[in-house]
Amino acid sequence: MFVLPDESRQLFKDPFGTLHRDIGTVLPELAGRTIYSVGDVVTHSLQQNGITPAIAVVDGQTMRSPCIKMPEIAGPCIHVKNPPGTITDELVSALTHAVDHTPVTILVDGEEDLAVIPLVIAAPLSSIVIYGQPNEGVVLRIVDDQAKTAARRLLTQFTKTESPIPHN
């Protein structure tokens, strides 16, 4: 398990890609691409626009409250535990498996926000990872070598632990 120390949390407030004010502005960029989504609202918005993400990572929450607009489950649903501020081995394993077995919905018990990092690492080149940036819009990240390197660099900010419970 990777645990994000409190002193490193601020590094993850900035968008990890290009910020767009609403989903409508990114739709043209998604045509013909493999799309991976993280977050209930962005996944629901994609589905409302006729796009089924190859992988949808959701947790039933929006800004720490129950999500009113739940996305539909596409393909098999993998349930994983991922406490806030962590990236569990279970989540990484599910993402790695899902990349080769799409479409898949990964339902997280805990928090899915940080799933963007291992998803960018696992996703094939030229695919797109899209996620919601609370109160700002959606973030689009085209997966290329630079994105994978940046994701691996962000992962170095975490503490690797074998403990199933984070110690913050």
Swiss-Prot record:
The keyword Magnesium does not apply. It holds the Pfam family DUF359. GO terms for biological process: coenzyme A biosynthetic process. GTP binds at residues 40-42, 59, 112. Its EC number is 2.7.1.237. One of its GO terms (molecular function) is GTP binding. The keyword Protein biosynthesis does not apply. Keywords: Coenzyme A biosynthesis, GTP-binding, Kinase, Nucleotide-binding, Transferase. It is an enzyme of class 2 (transferase). InterPro entries: GTP-dep_dephospho-CoA_kin. It catalyses: 3'-dephospho-CoA + GTP = GDP + CoA + H(+). Pathway: Cofactor biosynthesis; coenzyme A biosynthesis. It comes from the Archaea. Catalyzes the GTP-dependent phosphorylation of the 3'-hydroxyl group of dephosphocoenzyme A to form coenzyme A (CoA). Belongs to the GTP-dependent DPCK family. This is GTP-dependent dephospho-CoA kinase.
